[in-house]
């Protein structure tokens, strides 16, 4: 369980409370962003809201498997953000992301080393560890985008 605790800690670092790798995390970057900025488009870049949705989409999809459901996520739907038209819409998206992230980390913490090495749904997807670490790496990739887009939005105002 030491491995799962370390992996869960890395996951929480990027999403909820860490500063070790990037000196920031999603919660720090997005919590104080008004919905108007979250939906502000800079050229062809994704919006902050779209990136938050995208990361949450994958977390929720893998979380569904952790909780006994099927793997239903598809890349083509991962940016299918419903319209954000109010503070309430934006807050709901963020609250869903934070809640899913904490549930995800909790499931990871409870995984045995043996479970981490089991095939994830199908052998073609690798094992649980690979998929969890993939979510962490994917999250850091987009965290860099979030940070840069946020700076661009602030500079454009």
Give each language-model segment a name.
Residues 2-5, 11-23, 27, 35-80, ...:
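Short, contiguous alpha-helical
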